[in-house]
Swiss-Prot record:
The chain crosses the membrane at residues 21-41, 57-77, 312-332, 337-357. May convert lysophosphatidic acid (LPA) into phosphatidic acid by incorporating acyl moiety at the 2 position. Has no activity when expressed in bacteria or yeast. The gene is LPAT5. Pathway: Phospholipid metabolism; CDP-diacylglycerol biosynthesis; CDP-diacylglycerol from sn-glycerol 3-phosphate: step 2/3. It is a multi-pass membrane protein. Keywords: Acyltransferase, Lipid biosynthesis, Lipid metabolism, Membrane, Phospholipid biosynthesis, Phospholipid metabolism, Transferase, Transmembrane, Transmembrane helix. A motif (HXXXXD motif) lies at residues 100-105. It is an enzyme of class 2 (transferase). InterPro entries: Acyltransf_C (IPR032098), Plipid/glycerol_acylTrfase (IPR002123). CDD domains: LPLAT_LCLAT1-like. The lineage of its organism: Eukaryota, Viridiplantae, Streptophyta, Embryophyta, Tracheophyta. Belongs to the 1-acyl-sn-glycerol-3-phosphate acyltransferase family. This is Probable 1-acyl-sn-glycerol-3-phosphate acyltransferase 5. Widely expressed at low level.
Length: 375
């Protein structure tokens, strides 16, 4: 099934277009104000004192903003998100691996994370080119998403360095990784099959061959502080949605998400064995998707309930109210200091994202140094 980057015109109407534009304007404007005010204060200023409490604040404030997306998908667009497989606990620190059907798969992780109270703690390994997106590049940087060039000789040291900073078991963590390295298309699948045939690897029809090095590195760095690995399989019954399909609410009508919770004791320790384990996992995923396309559903559906509409409607209204107040103070009030602050924050976030700069926890470092001296 090929990815289409244009919306399905058969279902597109003027009402959907207007609703989509309004929703997108709300999401972009709220993102800007949350990044400028709470993002700068919690991820930059507070980080000078404590990385741990900085991450807690980022998780809270941006979890509130990210919750707008599942609300858009499920309550406004009426997309049915159907979960199946293992019922997962709320408190797990996990590494998630998933197939990559289309450009918006990663957004549906938020629907599961919201139900588990982890939406502010989810991080992704993503293409470095996405860090250049206006506004959203700032968000990816402040959320501590991990950019990769998809060239291992360049990525290994950077990946291990960033992932190792997530080792503290006191910090909540959902680290998401797409081992295929790119989204699925028929053309890519044919190239994957050709490579598999030439190298004696399994022939997969519904997924691409996984790239193992990133997964191995993440697992090795975090194994002592993880509770589990979640093997997530995403299926769409009809057309794979594009970003614009999501915005206009025309696709998908249903998203099926199957979760297999894997204890770390079930995963080998040696790199060669981990590679084989991941390859076998994608063979199982390929068969699971084959059955899904035949039957129209995954086994053991209905493991998660709908989220509380009232609770997240109040959350949406609170985020919009905060944005309205900040917009007024910045652009329409006589307080010039707000405009100066916003300008400086924009300059800093642009520079920090481009050069990958982060605040050094000076106070925390000084305290640790004093402890060592006193010993």
């Amino acid at each position: 099934m090929e990815k289409k980057s244009v919306p399905n015109s058969d279902k597109l109407s003027l009402i959907r277009v207007l609703r989509g534009i309004i929703c997108l304007m709300v999401l972009v404007s709220t993102a800007f104000m949350m990044l400028i005010f709470w993002g700068f204060l919690s991820a930059v200023v507070l980080r000078l004192f404590s990385i741990r409490y900085s991450r807690k604040c980022v998780s809270f404030f941006f979890g509130s903003w990210l919750a707008l997306w599942p609300f858009l998908f499920e309550k406004i667009n009426k997309t049915k998100v159907i979960f199946s497989g293992d019922k997962v606990p709320c408190e797990d620190r996990v590494l998630l691996i998933a197939n990559h059907r289309t450009e918006v798969d990663w957004m549906y992780f938020w629907d599961l994370a919201l139900r588990k109270g982890q939406i502010g703690n989810i991080k992704y390994v993503l293409k470095s080119s996405l860090m250049k997106l206006p506004l959203f590049g700032w968000a990816f940087h402040l959320f501590e998403f991990i950019p990769v060039e998809r060239r291992w000789e360049v990525d290994e040291a950077n990946l291990r360095q960033i992932v190792s900073s997530f080792k503290d078991p006191r910090d909540a963590l959902w680290l998401a990784l797409f081992p295929e390295g790119t989204d699925y298309t028929e053309a890519k699948c044919q190239r994957s099959k050709k490579f598999a045939a030439e190298n004696g690897l399994p022939i997969l029809n519904n997924v691409l061959l996984p790239r193992t090095k990133g997964f191995v590195s993440c697992l090795q760095e975090l194994s002592c502080s993880l509770d589990a690995v979640y093997d997530v399989t995403i299926g769409y019954k009809t057309r794979c949605p594009s970003f614009l399909d999501n915005v206009y609410g025309i696709e998908p009508s249903e998203v099926h998400i199957h979760i297999r919770r894997i204890n770390l004791t079930q995963i080998p320790n040696q790199e060669k064995d981990i590679n084989a384990w991941l390859m076998n996992t994608f063979q199982l995923k390929d068969q699971l998707l084959n059955d899904f396309y035949s039957n129209g559903h995954f086994p053991n559906e209905g493991t998660e309930k709908e989220f509380n509409t009232k609770k997240y409607l109040i959350n949406c209204l609170a985020v919009i109210a905060f944005t309205t107040i900040c917009t007024h103070l910045t652009f329409f009030s006589s307080m010039i200091w707000f405009r100066i602050y916003v300008s400086l924050a924009c300059v800093y976030l642009t520079s920090a994202t481009h050069f990958n700069l982060r605040s050094v926890p000076l106070v925390e470092t000084a305290k640790n140094s004093l402890k060592l001296v006193n010993k």
